Amino acid sequence: MINSCVIPVIKSPSDYQAYRISPDDSNRLAIVFDPAIANSSLTCCVEIFDVGGKTPPNRHLFALEMFFILKGEGRATCDGKTVNIKAGDSLLVPATGTHIIENTGSGRLYTLTIMVPNEDFAELIRSGTPVELDAEDMAVLGRQYQ
């Protein structure tokens, strides 16, 4: 017998807050869920890489990071091993793995990025510069592209 009812948190792309962590970064992150929204130690965001864009080399002490490629193509490097990635691929980066995600395609690269536990990732994102999602971003997130 169910004794409680939990109402899920539902968001749409127009609700997402997007940031560029550093002014010179060539990727943006649109927060879908984070500890402040989900009351759980996770960060879920859509990461948008401009043509030629990439993350700086980074690693996490405790967190796993998963990337699901929504659109585009690129290259992922973790601890010196490089693989090509494209729409539909999933990539799981273990804790302590030094990694880079890079857009090698002719258009933007979009990933659904999930980090568990949060390990201050959401706070890092929110400390950056707020940016707007443009029409191309909204079309991808709203599944309005072919």
Regions inferred by a protein language model and the residue ranges of each:
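A short hydrophobic beta-strand segment most commonly corresponding to one strand
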Residues: V46-E47, L92, G107-E123
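A generic "binding-loop/recognition-motif" signal
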Residues: D25, F62-A63, K81, G97-T98, ...
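A short, N-terminal "cap"/entry segment at the start of jelly-roll beta-barrel domains
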Residues: M1-L42, R126-Q146
